[in-house]
Curated annotation (Swiss-Prot):
It is an enzyme of class 5 (isomerase). GO terms for molecular function: 1-(5-phosphoribosyl)-5-[(5-phosphoribosylamino)methylideneamino]imidazole-4-carboxamide isomerase activity. It catalyses: 1-(5-phospho-beta-D-ribosyl)-5-[(5-phospho-beta-D-ribosylamino)methylideneamino]imidazole-4-carboxamide = 5-[(5-phospho-1-deoxy-D-ribulos-1-ylimino)methylamino]-1-(5-phospho-beta-D-ribosyl)imidazole-4-carboxamide. It is found in: Cytoplasm. It comes from the Bacteria. The lineage of its organism: Bacteria, Bacillati, Bacillota, Clostridia, Eubacteriales. This is 1-(5-phosphoribosyl)-5-[(5-phosphoribosylamino)methylideneamino] imidazole-4-carboxamide isomerase.
Length: 236
């Protein structure tokens, strides 16, 4: 299982939100690039970077910073947030990113998702963000009619190899992941499931490994010190 340290960017700064709320922002650093270097130096094998401004506006607001992170680090970097067309996917991949996460666009623009999976194959991951079991879109501010598992099965049938599954109710709350939901998702599909949301201590990461997910994104817990990244990597 891979541990993905998360870097969320608003206004060029490294931040964390609580339950996806843009009105509840904590700034953890002025330089996302320096933060990325820190996680790499502590042994991270892959980095997860989100343009939160982009997720909300539908445009790549922090693209230059994100490409700078990818060019600075030796480890692979995946990114999402505001990627609504193939041109943006291409810009990020040519800028050094290893994997692109499609969230809202995967739900609302099926043609684009099909084209992206056909063109870029394993370099595309689908972000499935669930609120009360339903898929949330537009920076988590709206919900769709899909259940998370239904949508996952559909994108798998279209050729997706990786999904990032976030339980919004747990995100940024440090109250533990939704193990039942993660296990249900991992059992329902054969593609890689990366779990996100709620990790608050090392035990959560070990418990998630038992659900069958292939990776876990850790955000707030490594910023507050609740989880020691080096220790967590060694433990799994």
């Amino acid at each position: 299982m891979i541990i993905y340290p998360a870097i969320d960017i608003i206004d060029g700064k490294c931040v964390r939100l609580q339950q996806g709320s843009y009105s509840d922002v904590t700034v953890f650093g002025d330089s996302p690039v320096d933060m990325a270097r820190k996680w790499e130096s502590l042994g991270a094998g892959y980095l997860h970077v989100v343009d939160l401004d982009g997720a909300r506006s539908g445009k790549s607001e922090n693209a230059e910073i994100i490409k700078q992170i990818a060019k600075t680090l030796k480890i692979p970097v995946q990114t999402g947030g505001g990627i609504r067309n193939l041109e943006t996917v291409e810009t990020y991949l040519s800028g050094g990113l290893s994997r692109i996460i499609l969230g809202t666009s995967a739900v609302s623009n099926r043609e684009m998702l099909i084209s992206a999976l056909k063109e870029y194959k394993g370099k595309i991951a689908v972000g499935i963000d669930a609120k009360d079991g339903k898929v949330a879109i537009h920076g988590w501010e709206k919900t769709s009619d899909y259940t998370a598992v239904e949508f996952a099965k559909e994108v798998e049938s279209l050729g997706a190899k990786t999904i990032i599954y976030t339980d919004i109710s747990r995100d940024g709350m440090l109250k533990g992941p939704n193990l039942q939901a993660m296990k249900e998702m991992a059992d329902s599909v054969s593609m890689d499931v990366i779990a996100s949301g709620g990790v608050s201590r090392l035990k959560d990461i070990i418990d998630l490994k038992q659900t069958g997910v292939s990776g876990v994104i850790v955000g707030k817990a490594i910023y507050t010190g609740n989880v020691d990244l080096k220790e967590a990597i060694l433990a799994i």
